[in-house]
């Protein structure tokens, strides 16, 4: 079984042996190029150089990063801001300390044969939507379009989509949720051509929310030793991300080396890394506060059922990146 030992257990110094600082990272999803920067940082010794021993935990359909960190199973998690803010409003004090992804990769992918050409055409159609926190951007978008999501006339029928593209292939839905770097290509690989599809990127529609940020528990940041570990972790992780952007094929192979399931393929991971690089491009890891505020505004635009009911305070900090990016 392929497994990469993250970081170094011991760093030998002139004065003796000093144990590396442990950091556990919980990913939002399974091992794939969506998280290449962290695997690359480990493989290239970036964490080791910072004196860190980083354990990377893959996610999955039954793993919620917020629940893992709440239970003490991770020091830092990768999550989308909508789900992090929703969790914060419900009492889990998650704080964004860095934002490697500058752009959103989320979109609706529709069959052209359904007649959908613009968002207004969603009316009276069935749309596949991911849940478990991934539904928040979609629900806000539909609210802004004035489309009810209860299946009533003139609204849309929401199909609770599994983490696959079957509803589109089987024509159970006119559109499904996809990521630019993953499920869209699963549709293409299934034999449907780009010309047979119509896509609506959340980024282009003006309803994008921030994805794949790094989150910790607020009270932990009060500990100077923990904060220092996070500064080192973010600095090393961003080195990994920039290397992955510049060397996408190599990064994809590093990801494959860490896929203990054997489910990923070289073709898919190289393609995914090429698309993910477009989303991390332009980010040095520091959160764009304007983008965060836009995310908040989008989530609060949910009419009678907003994702969050009040603008959060203390939901992000630049304290870590200010030091990490000096």
List where the protein language model places each region.
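Positively charged n-region of N-terminal signal peptides that target proteins for export
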Residues: 1-4
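Bacterial N-terminal signal peptides
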Residues: 7-13
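Sec/Tat signal peptide C-region and signal peptidase I cleavage site
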Residues: 15-20
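Short, glycine-/small- and polar/acidic-enriched structural segments
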Residues: 22-161, 167-170, 174-181, 202, ...
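Pocket-lining segment of extracytoplasmic ligand-binding domains
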Residues: 82-83, 163-260
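Short, surface-exposed acidic
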Residues: 149-156, 194-198, 227, 260-273, ...
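Secondary-structure end/capping motifs
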Residues: 222-305
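Conserved C-terminal helix/tail region of periplasmic/extracytoplasmic solute-binding proteins
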Residues: 293-326
């Amino acid at each position: 079984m392929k497994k990469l030992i993250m970081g170094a257990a011991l760093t030998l110094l002139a004065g003796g042996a000093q144990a590396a600082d442990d950091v556990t990272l919980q990913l939002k999803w399974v091992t794939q190029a969506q998280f290449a920067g962290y695997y690359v940082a480990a493989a290239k010794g970036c964490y080791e150089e910072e004196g860190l021993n980083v354990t990377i935990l893959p996610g999955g359909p039954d793993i919620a990063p917020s629940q893992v960190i709440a239970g003490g199973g991770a020091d830092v998690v990768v999550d989308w801001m909508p789900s992090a803010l929703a969790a914060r409003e419900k009492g889990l004090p998650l704080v964004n300390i860095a934002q490697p992804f500058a752009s959103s990769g989320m979109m609706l992918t529709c069959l052209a044969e359904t007649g959908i050409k613009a968002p207004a055409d969603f009316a009276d159609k069935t749309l596949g939507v991911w849940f478990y926190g991934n539904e928040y951007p979609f629900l806000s978008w539909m609210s802004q379009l004035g489309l009810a999501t209860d299946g009533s006339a003139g609204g849309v029928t929401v199909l609770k989509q599994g983490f696959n593209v079957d509803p589109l292939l089987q024509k159970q839905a006119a559109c499904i949720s996809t990521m630019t770097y993953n499920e869209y290509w699963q549709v293409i690989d299934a034999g449907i051509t780009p010309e047979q599809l119509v896509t609506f990127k959340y980024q282009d529609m003006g309803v994008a929310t921030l994805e794949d940020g790094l989150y910790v528990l607020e009270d932990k940041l009060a500990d100077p030793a923990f904060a220092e570990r996070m500064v080192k972790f973010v600095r090393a992780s961003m080195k990994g991300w920039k290397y992955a952007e510049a060397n996408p094929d190599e990064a994809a192979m590093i990801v494959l080396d860490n896929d203990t399931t054997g489910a990923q393929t070289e073709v898919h991971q190289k393609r995914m890394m090429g698309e993910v690089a477009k989303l991390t491009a332009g980010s040095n890891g520091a959160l764009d506060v304007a983008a965060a505020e836009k995310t908040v505004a989008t989530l609060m635009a949910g009419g009678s059922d907003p994702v969050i009911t009040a603008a959060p305070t203390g939901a992000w900090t630049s304290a870590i990146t200010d030091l990490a990016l000096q």
